[in-house]
Amino acid sequence: MKQPRTLVLSIGLLASMPVMASDIAGGQSPAQDGVHYINAGESTLNAGPHRSGRAGISLGPYANAARVDVASLAPYATTVVRGATTVRTLGPDAGLPFATAGVGYFSFVQVGNADVWFGEWSSSGAHADFNHRQVFFVGDRAGTSLPAGIVTYTLAGINRFDGSGVLEGALRANLDTGTVTAGLVGTGYRLAASGTLDRATGAFSGSAIANGSIIGTSSGQFFGAGASAVTGIATFAGNSQFDTSFGGQRN
């Protein structure tokens, strides 16, 4: 049974200053084997509707491990609207312009209109208990800058998405004092995380705790001018059912 969830994230920021990086940033939870896995980063495939140099995802050894830009997958996905969040779901029957055997099942969300995405992948989908599931985030951090003062974000989160709902919450960052707190609210599930920001890149990493005792890690990235978007993941080795991806726009 799919459980509702609550995520609380507390991130210590080292400083507030412009981020001059112009490349793609991303991350994913650990793979469960050497065949069924994804990898987030800069897209490398330049064929058909696919373009290199964008936020991308690869499927293990599939297509020689070339990363496909997520934006080119979006038109083939089915959209599921839950509140203010549009989740795109995509499986082997999506009609992609390349062989679909082994593609698995994606649920992913675009943050605003930017080339910034978060979601999850599994080899079997919700109908078969999300085998080999991984969560991910990826986006273009060109022109990212971190402002002074307080910024807030409306968040959504993905965890074993079966079409019924997404996590909802908010993030508040006081960039004068260097602290960020966030929460994704559900029922019966608690996640807490803390970390620090690399001011040169806009990336953060740290620890996470599920249900008060299960220890994991958190990582993520601020994107855009004025830190207009944020995405990240919380992961738990040996307890991947708690792995969650999240993201949102600055209010």
Model-predicted regions and their roles:
Residues 16-18:
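N-terminal signal peptide c-region/cleavage motif recognized by signal peptidases
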